[in-house]
Amino acid sequence: YRRLLQPYFNRCRWKPDDFKTVIKAITEATAEYDDGETAICFMGHGTEADSNAVYAKMQDMLASEGYEHYYVGTVEAEPSLEDVIAKVKEGEYKKVVLEPLMIVAGDHANNDMAGDEDGSWKKEFEKAGYDVTCLVRGLGELEPIQQLFTEHAQAAIDSLK
């Protein structure tokens, strides 16, 4: 899908409205857990490329929108699992909800996030003393995200005309 959307992304990187759409979608999808006692943590893929800055941008926008119980980390880069655990420890949380910040919930979601082996996000949060719930679903399952992809695909097609 990246190649299809590349002409669009080359012109319109990190659109604030896209972030707002994603934030609205993920906060609505996890609203039942936002009880003040639960940290809601999203695990993105991450990359060493400059585009990794989207995770810090997402965290900043979540905070600016008042979602102080929401945290963003990555499997492959920064912020790391250790960074997220440190942030969560600053709060007085009893529970943690983990969800992938990925279009599809595949290997990283099932193993690195929700796996039962040492080193998984689930196990590391449990070791830190939290009751952990894993929501193994991709962002692509959320209707607002599907709509966003449709809009981007249409914009990419239109840019080729």
Regions found by a protein language model. Name each.
Residues 1-161:
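Extended amphipathic ligand-handling, pore-lining, and cofactor/metal-binding catalytic surfaces
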